[in-house]
């Protein structure tokens, strides 16, 4: 069907290369080619948007700091104010597969730096950037914090992370759940055979370590695939099961093909039709002399037919045992998919 050519005849990328960055668990460059012209931008932009906004991840959604009533406070013996501490907390990279909120705790006495690695976790929660500095304690200072970790996608502002029954002193935190931190892409020309007008898509993906760049890209592609499925309101054409082959057919099934399917010139086709030559099996049993005796059939038509038959491994003057078979029309239909 002509309509199927809309997608079946488009070039599909058949080459995918992954080049790890200086931190292979977090950075990678992926190259896909060849793509139809314009498809590099179409796919690159769609993948980038989904990577940054739609992948599930974990983040701190709220924090409670002992002795602190609100975000605009300061803590004795802590050099940073609470606002700065909360900003640092936002950047904690977390891996968690739990669907329910989890708790983390921190207790540290100065002097010294307080880092994400000082946080005590439970279950499957893992801190991916333990060297992240949260605050600095002076001699004798102490800080205690309790964090709530949840999973989600995209960016959720702090006001949406405040529970209705939030206790006094609970500070909601802006949550950036996406494990992907940066995505860029570029489009270059590439070759497909003799065609130089195709796209090469190069994407560089950086994550926080909760997911590999390759997996993140695969998840994004799957999301796009699933979202587009509803628009595919037709099914792929179903191939009917081929009828079983005759077990002892004494000739090549290609001989059951009709001569009007050989794409001959009008003159040659009409000559065969006037001579009641219907199938290739009828044609190849004719000799050159017999064909030249056909009205209006000349040397040019003869050469044309010889070339077509030669391309099929056949020639005029062949002996075909068992031709014509009984029920030739039924046999021709049964063997249609085999020639």
Swiss-Prot record:
Residues 1-235 are annotated as: Alpha N-terminal domain (alpha-NTD). GO terms for cellular component: cytoplasm; DNA-directed RNA polymerase complex. SMART domains: RPOLD. Keywords: DNA-directed RNA polymerase, Nucleotidyltransferase, Transcription, Transferase. Disulfide bonds: none annotated. GO terms for molecular function: DNA binding; DNA-directed RNA polymerase activity; protein dimerization activity. GO terms for biological process: DNA-templated transcription. It catalyses: RNA(n) + a ribonucleoside 5'-triphosphate = RNA(n+1) + diphosphate. Pfam families: RNA_pol_A_bac, RNA_pol_A_CTD, RNA_pol_L. It is an enzyme of class 2 (transferase). Residues 251-339 are annotated as: Alpha C-terminal domain (alpha-CTD). The keyword Transferase applies. Its EC number is 2.7.7.6. DNA-dependent RNA polymerase catalyzes the transcription of DNA into RNA using the four ribonucleoside triphosphates as substrates. The N-terminal domain is essential for RNAP assembly and basal transcription, whereas the C-terminal domain is involved in interaction with transcriptional regulators and with upstream promoter elements. Homodimer. The RNAP catalytic core consists of 2 alpha, 1 beta, 1 beta' and 1 omega subunit. When a sigma factor is associated with the core the holoenzyme is formed, which can initiate transcription. Belongs to the RNA polymerase alpha chain family. HAMAP family: RNApol_bact_RpoA. This is DNA-directed RNA polymerase subunit alpha. It comes from Methylobacterium nodulans (strain LMG 21967 / CNCM I-2342 / ORS 2060).
């Amino acid at each position: 069907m002509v309509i199927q050519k809309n997608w079946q005849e488009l070039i599909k990328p058949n080459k995918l290369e992954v080049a790890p960055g200086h931190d292979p668990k977090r950075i990678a460059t992926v190259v896909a080619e060849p793509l139809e012209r314009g498809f590099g931008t179409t796919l690159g932009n769609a993948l980038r948007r989904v990577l940054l906004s739609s992948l599930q991840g974990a983040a701190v959604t709220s924090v409670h700091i002992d002795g602190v009533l609100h975000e605009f406070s300061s803590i004795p013996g802590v050099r940073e104010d609470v606002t700065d501490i909360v900003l640092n907390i936002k950047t904690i990279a977390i891996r968690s597969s739990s669907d329910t909120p989890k708790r983390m705790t921190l207790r540290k006495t100065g002097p010294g730096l307080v880092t994400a690695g000082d946080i005590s976790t439970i279950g499957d929660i893992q801190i991916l950037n333990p060297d992240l500095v949260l605050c600095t304690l002076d001699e004798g200072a102490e800080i205690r914090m309790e964090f709530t970790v949840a999973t989600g996608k995209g960016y959720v502002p702090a006001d949406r992370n405040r529970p209705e029954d939030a206790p006094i002193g609970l500070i909601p935190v802006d949550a950036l759940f996406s494990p992907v931190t940066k995505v860029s892409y570029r489009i270059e020309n590439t070759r497909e055979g003799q065609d130089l007008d195709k796209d090469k898509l190069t994407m560089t993906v950086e994550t926080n370590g909760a997911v590999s760049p390759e997996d993140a890209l695969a998840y994004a592609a799957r999301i796009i695939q699933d979202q587009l499925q509803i628009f595919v309101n037709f099914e792929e054409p179903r191939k009917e099961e081929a009828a079983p082959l005759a077990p002892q057919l004494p000739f090549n099934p290609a001989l059951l093909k009709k001569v009007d399917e050989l794409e001959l010139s009008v003159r040659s086709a009409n000559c065969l039709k006037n001579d009641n030559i219907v199938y290739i099996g009828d044609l190849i049993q004719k000799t050159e002399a017999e064909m030249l005796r056909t009205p209006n059939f000349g040397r040019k038509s003869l050469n044309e037919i010889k070339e077509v038959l030669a391309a099929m491994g056949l020639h005029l003057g062949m002996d075909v045992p068992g031709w014509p078979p009984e029920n030739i029309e039924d046999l021709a239909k049964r063997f249609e998919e085999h020639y």
